[in-house]
C-alpha cells in the first residue's frame, strides 16, 4: 500500500463554527414565521466574529443576509464619538453575551432573536397629505423594517441607559436584551414598540 492511499484526508470535518468560540447557532429557534428569512442566524451565516466586512448596503434587501449579531454590532457604533469603532462594539457585544449567559443560563443568540421578535412593531402610522391637510394612516410594517427598527430600538435603549450611569454599556445592553426577550415593560424597545402600535391603532 502506497503512502498516498494511507494519507489522511486533506480536509477533515469542518469544525462547528461558534460565535466568539462559545455560542453555537444550531439550536437557535426563530418562532415568528414572518421573520425567518430576515434574521440571519443559521449555520450558513455562522461566524467566529461579527465582523465580515461585507458589502451589504450595495444592493436592496441584501442587508437581510448580514449575520444578525453583526447588524447589532454595527448599530452600536452610533453617536459621533463612536463612529467606526467596530472593535470596541465587538468587545461590548461579547461582554454583553457573557453577562446574558450568566444571568439566564440560555444561549445569548436565542435571547437576541427573541428580543428582536418582541421589539419589532407590527403596525405603524404614516403621513398622508390630502388637499393641504395632513392626516396619519395606520399601515402594516414589512418584516425587514420590523427587524431594522427592533435592532435600532434595542441599541438606543442600551445607549441611553448607559449614559451618565455607573453601569457599563455591556451591562445595559445585556439588561435591555433580557427584558425585551421576556417582553417586559422595563425594556426601552418594548415601551417604544407599544407606543408606536398604540398610535397606529388610534389612526386606523
UniProtKB/Swiss-Prot annotation:
CC terms in the record's Gene Ontology section: cytoplasm; cytosol; cytosolic ribosome; cytosolic small ribosomal subunit; extracellular exosome; focal adhesion; membrane; nucleolus
Modified residues (N6-acetyllysine): 47
Record PTM Phosphothreonine, positions in chain: 14
PROSITE patterns xref list: RIBOSOMAL_S7 (PS00052)
Localization: Cytoplasm; Nucleus, Nucleolus
GO molecular function: mRNA binding; RNA binding; rRNA binding; structural constituent of ribosome
Residues recorded as bearing Phosphoserine in the entry: 142
CDD domains linked: uS7_Eukaryote
Role played: Component of the small ribosomal subunit. The ribosome is a large ribonucleoprotein complex responsible for the synthesis of proteins in the cell. Part of the small subunit (SSU) processome, first precursor of the small eukaryotic ribosomal subunit. During the assembly of the SSU processome in the nucleolus, many ribosome biogenesis factors, an RNA chaperone and ribosomal proteins associate with the nascent pre-rRNA and work in concert to generate RNA folding, modifications, rearrangements and cleavage as well as targeted degradation of pre-ribosomal RNA by the RNA exosome.
PANTHER family: RIBOSOMAL PROTEIN S7
Full protein name: Small ribosomal subunit protein uS7
Amino acid at each position: 500500500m502506497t503512502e498516498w492511499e494511507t494519507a489522511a484526508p486533506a480536509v477533515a470535518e469542518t469544525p462547528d463554527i461558534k460565535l466568539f468560540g462559545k455560542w453555537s447557532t444550531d439550536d437557535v429557534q426563530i418562532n415568528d414565521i414572518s421573520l425567518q428569512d430576515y434574521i440571519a442566524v443559521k449555520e450558513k451565516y455562522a461566524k467566529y466574529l461579527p465582523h465580515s466586512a461585507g458589502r451589504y448596503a450595495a444592493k436592496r434587501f441584501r442587508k437581510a443576509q448580514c449575520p444578525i449579531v453583526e447588524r447589532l454590532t454595527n448599530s452600536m457604533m452610533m453617536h459621533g464619538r463612536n463612529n467606526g469603532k467596530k472593535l470596541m462594539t465587538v468587545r461590548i457585544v461579547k461582554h454583553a453575551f457573557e453577562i446574558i449567559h450568566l444571568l439566564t443560563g440560555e444561549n445569548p443568540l436565542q435571547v437576541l432573536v427573541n428580543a428582536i421578535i418582541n421589539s419589532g412593531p407590527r403596525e405603524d402610522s404614516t403621513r398622508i397629505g390630502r388637499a393641504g391637510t395632513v392626516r396619519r394612516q395606520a399601515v402594516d410594517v414589512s418584516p425587514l423594517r420590523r427587524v431594522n427598527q427592533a435592532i435600532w430600538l434595542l441599541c438606543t435603549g442600551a445607549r441611553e441607559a448607559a449614559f451618565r450611569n455607573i453601569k457599563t454599556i455591556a451591562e445595559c445592553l445585556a439588561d435591555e436584551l433580557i427584558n425585551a426577550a421576556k417582553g417586559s415593560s422595563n425594556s426601552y424597545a418594548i415601551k417604544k414598540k407599544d407606543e408606536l402600535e398604540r398610535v397606529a391603532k388610534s389612526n386606523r
